[in-house]
Amino acid sequence: MYLVFDTETTGLPKKWNAPLSDLDNWPRCVQLAWQLHDSKGILISSHSYLIKPDNYNIPYESEKIHGISTALATNIGYDLVSVLNKFIKDLSLAGFIIGHNVKFDLNIIGAELLRVSSDVNLLEKDILDTCTELTANVCKIPGGRGGKFKFPTLIELYSFLFNDNFSEAHNASADVEATARAFFELVRIGIINQSVFKGYPELSEGLRTFDESKVPLFGIKHLNLKKESEKISDKASKENPVDKKIIDSIPEKLISSPFSHLHNNTQFSVLQSTSRIANIVKKAGESNMPAIAITDRGNMMGCFHFIKAIKSYNNSISSDSSDTKIKPIIGCELNVCLNHKDKSNRDDGYQIVFLAKNKNGYRNLSKMCSVGYTEGFYYVPRVDREVVEKYKEDLIVLSGNMHGEIASKLLNIGESQAEEALLYWKNLFEKDFYLEMMRHGQEDEKRVNENLIKFSSKHDVMVVPTNNSFYLNKEDANAHDILLCVKDGEKQSTPIGRGRGFRYGLPNQEYYFKTSNEMKFLFKDYPEFFDNISEIVDKVEVYELARDVLLPKFTIPEDFESDSDIDLENEYLKFLTFQGAKNHYKDIDNDLEERILFELNVIKNSGYPGYFLIVQDLIKAAIEMGVSVGPGRGSAAGSVVAYCLGITKIDPIKYDLLFERFLNPDRVSMPDIDIDFDDEGRGRVIEYVIEKYGANQVAQIITYGKMAAKSSIRDTARVLDLSLGDADRIAKLIPNLKLKDIFEKDEKKLNDDLRSEDFSNVLELKSLSNGDDLQAETINQARILEGSLRNVGTHACGIIITPDDITNFVPIATAKDSDLFVTQYDNSVVESAGLLKMDFLGLKTL
């Protein structure tokens, strides 16, 4: 007989080659499942048992993989001895033990047998493994050691043999059924044969029934462990309302104390956070927070959107409402290393949080953040202490997370070195330096916090409670973990840890944007810390980032004479326009003169004469360099001034084109002139701009590559190990709509808006999302990830020119595909931020 078995565990061993007697090394078995088949492959019995934890908990990271929570195993699990006795009884009937990567499972059960003082020896049986070089050479998946094929996972082997996916991977019961089916199929097709095991002839004979088709499934129903764990969690939440429990345990004097989150990552921490700015603001409002800060890693891309979102929220609060208006605090988490210009060795430095107290602080933070990219980028953007000292004015500093300098030195070097670091930051920022205490439920934080309290008292440095948030709600933890896997190209099934065979991941699911009451509950033993947060909030001023567009100064020729120095640009523009009119028109009659003067007056009142002078200068320079220039496009063709200056080559008088479509006197906005150059000449024009205005005043515009509906499905599917076929099929069900719209819009509205075929696909997609399988999980996690920033790039044609050093206005970065700097703000906000944007298009057809 054949016994096929599998286990789910509390994790992985520290040492794979440790003896079974080293019981501390071997994880505990939380599920044991097996099937017993006769000598011809016929299923005799199947069993699956959860094991009740005995003085241990099931780690969250393991629960994420197999779905078995401590609560679920405690509620429906069996004691270890009774499960092992049932297993041993069937084991005694079998001559062969079968598994996938079976050595691991043999060690797990072997260790458990030792724990209960059993003398059963599993190795007395013949062992057959479906994860060997034999199956590796069948599946032919590249990536193995020494140039060989890699050993296939159970999903990969199953998919290869049956061109299908089994959805309950990492449920021992389903894994056993899949392993058994794969094993018998390998025997049926002769891959596993007489040369591998002695029972082949009889088993092969029994499998002849399936000569015309593949070995079928055995029809076993599997309990959805993740759903069952969620049910218990939901039930517990209803029976013990968390908010009420939390509020009841908060000291009365702390209930009315305000709390503000000062350490938050948004979606602009690329591939590291799922939190949308608008959602953070909304949740902060619901929790009556008087302020919130954003502190994205190494960049300030979200600042403008943050200010805008808070302004919108505050404007929505009526004057008679009791809701609290929110103060925005702009910040950034910077990597402070030893020498930011040294790129001979990797030094990511320490993660330190900086908050801007006012507009000047924002400028200094913007400059520091820019230096991190333009001078210090090496794996990550970096600054050093010298840079911090240069731009420290009007900044508040928080000591950071476990990767901050003080915490990191406490954990890795020593207390005295950590204390020296504290004194450096305290002496530099005085009362604007604060120690940051976190309670995510980690042992390393407990060790650090003990010292922070001691340091605070000894050196008179205030402590503030924070929660380093990367996602909005606790239930978003899994989606965030998937995002981290997307970033690193990993599968979620890869265990979290360091070194080969492990991946990066957060230690637990506590890194969410907690409510005020949750934070008060966490720090109820230190109520005075909340006053320190209020002190920081009071130090921060409210300021605007939006401003009118600032044009670079256009140099008027010295020989140009004017009656007014104040109106020099308007006078020179008028001079050039009429000079051009003489070249374009035989006769300047009253109607033409009136039209020109009308346009010049509108341009004067708009305050943008310099813009026209700059554009005509660029076009003139391009022509002189032999660069082909297009005739003009869009509404600018309606301007006779643009025509006379040579900006456009279309006569608006001849074709009766309206100037008001270009620049309306009743609704003045920044004119927008797109300029076409030949593809090769465009670069020469940009070089001219850099030479004329300076490299520190010219930049391209960043673009944000977001995870759209289909790409979020495909990325999530890859991380969760859903088959390519299923991922492709699901992605193709999505019409040209966001997942958010598909799942939140009324079905009648969707039916009205979509073609019948697309609507049918949408209904199928929704139906799949309600399932209990891997396809449903893929869809539902992709819904959370949709819209997350996946990468950054550069705008195809946008160029920014500023009147002074660009970092005086916005933070900048570097880009792989550009020699120019790029703004950290994208095209949607650069004009609102006061930047002159010009579109230089390169066309091969010119």
Regions found by a protein language model. Name each.
Residues 172-182, 634:
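Alpha-helical transmembrane segments that form the membrane-embedded catalytic/substrate-binding core
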Residues 121-137, 263, 400, 406:
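Histidine/lysine/aspartate-rich catalytic loop segments that bind and position anionic ligands
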Residues 180-247:
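Acidic two-metal-ion nuclease catalytic site recognized across multiple nuclease folds
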Residues 1-122, 139, 143-164, 170:
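Conserved non-catalytic scaffold segment of RNase H-like nuclease domains
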Residues 113-124, 372-380:
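A short alpha->loop->secondary-structure connector
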Residues 232, 236-846:
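Alpha-helical scaffold/interaction cores of sigma-54-like transcription cofactors
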Residues 2-4, 46-48, 73, 127, ...:
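Conserved beta-strand scaffold positions in the cores of enzyme catalytic domains, especially
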Residues 66-69, 128, 603:
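N-terminal phosphate-binding loop and flanking beta/alpha elements of the actin-like ATPase fold
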